[in-house]
Structures are given as C-alpha cells and as structure tokens.
C-alpha cells in the first residue's frame, strides 16, 4: 500500500521558499530567485529524479514523435526521451535562463533536442507543430494555467496527446498545496473545459517514488 511518496525536489523547493519568504501555495517558478548557484545545485541533486523516467517510459513514445516538455528544467526528461524518439524532434521550454543553460550543457551530442527560453503561457512554437506534450511537476507553477492549457491545445496536432505528471504524495493529492489544481480531479476538470477529450489517470510507482500520470487528447 502506498503511504507517502515525496519528491526530493519538493523539499529543496521548500527550503528556497523559506529563505525568500515566499508563500509556496501562491508561487510561480519565476518568483523563485534561481541563481546560478541554486540552479546548479538543484541540477546535481535532483535533476535525474525518477519521476522523469517514470513519465517518459509510460507515454508511448515512438521514434518519430515530435515532443514538447513544458518546464523542462535541466533537460533530464527530454534527454531520456531523445534515446527513444531518435528520428523525431524534441523541444524543451523553460522560463529560467539558468536552467536552459544547464540543459544545453547536459544534452547528448549530436542531439535532436532544442531548448527554448519561454513559458507555458506563450509557447514559442507554431500551431499544430507537436504530437505529444509533457509537463512534469510543472503545471502548478504556471503563472496562468488556463492560458497555458490553451497554448498546449494550440501547439498540439489533431489527435495529439498531453501528459501531466505529478509526484504522488499521501495517496491522494499532487503534493503542491491548496489551489485551483490541488487534486487530480481539479486538473482533469480544467482539461475538459479547455476542450481535451479521453482524459484518464494512471499511477506508476518504483521503489519509494511514484507519479500520477494524466493523459488527454486533442480531438481536432
């Protein structure tokens, strides 16, 4: 039975927020002071968290997929994805320049990954340009999640898939505190409002970690 799965990254985030006197229940990633030192330390300690593997290995990636990772951070997830999606194209978008710089240094060479400084609310890609989108522990940090969901819908091709992955905490919620996206049901309701269909939820676990993985589809 699952008792408690807690990402180490959440503990580190709490430490940063306490030092900066920021309310973690009302925070976007841009509000954290991501100094080079903080970002480098985060990359070393938490960049390869198992949630990346659990997500990438359960979204049915194909060699020729065109994948977008929103809030890619240090690029750990897309680096894993590139070894499966080796004939396609992968985009990693993050609003933190230091994270993008670390991701660029860490990617395999040669690589089919393109890292872009940007946000969920203004994805720097064309309409209907990707067929899979992932957001791993990032949707709760979007400044305007409703606008972000509309942007995901815009860049997805017809029948494209969107996956939202969050760490399992206390068996029931997403571990990000009170807010409009506190539970999986909240997230799934917002996806439905945005026009996504075939919305499902599946949990995946490995050792002492696990994820909630929500999948949905753009109809056309």
Identify the function of each model-found stretch.
Residues 9-60, 76-80, 99, 106, 163-186, ...:
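Conserved class I S-adenosyl-L-methionine
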Residues 66, 160-161:
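Short glycine-centered segments of the SAM/dcSAM-binding site in methyltransferase folds
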Residues 68-70, 74-122:
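Class I SAM-dependent methyltransferase SAM/SAH-binding core
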Residues 121-132:
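A short acidic, Gly/Pro-enriched loop at the edge of an enzyme's catalytic core
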Residues 132-144:
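A short SAM/SAH-binding and catalytic strip from SAM-dependent methyltransferases
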Residues 146-158:
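A short glycine-rich, Lys/Arg-flanked "PGG" loop and its adjoining helix->strand segment in the class I
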Residues 203-220:
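Core SAM-dependent methyltransferase catalytic element
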């Amino acid at each position: 039975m699952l008792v408690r799965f807690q990402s180490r990254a959440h503990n580190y985030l709490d430490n940063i927020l306490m030092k900066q006197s920021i309310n973690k229940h009302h925070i976007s990633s841009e509000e954290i002071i991501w100094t080079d030192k903080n970002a480098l330390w985060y990359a070393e300690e938490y960049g390869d968290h198992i949630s990346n593997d659990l997500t990438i290995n359960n979204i049915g990636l194909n060699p020729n997929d065109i994948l977008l990772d929103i809030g890619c951070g240090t690029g750990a997830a897309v680096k894993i994805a590139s070894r499966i999606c080796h004939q396609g194209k992968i985009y990693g978008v993050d609003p933190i320049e230091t994270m993008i710089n670390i991701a660029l240094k860490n990617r395999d060479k040669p690589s089919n990954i393109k890292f872009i400084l940007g946000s969920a609310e203004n994805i720097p890609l064309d309409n209907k340009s990707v067929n899979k989108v992932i957001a791993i522990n990032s949707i709760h940090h979007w400044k305007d999640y409703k606008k972000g969901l509309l942007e995901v819908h815009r860049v997805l091709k017809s029948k494209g898939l969107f996956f939202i992955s969050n760490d399992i905490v206390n068996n029931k919620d997403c571990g990000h505190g009170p807010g409009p996206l506190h539970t999986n049901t909240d997230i799934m309701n917002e996806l439905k409002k945005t026009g996504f269909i075939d919305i499902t939820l599946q949990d995946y676990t490995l050792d002492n970690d696990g994820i909630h993985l929500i999948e949905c589809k753009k109809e056309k």
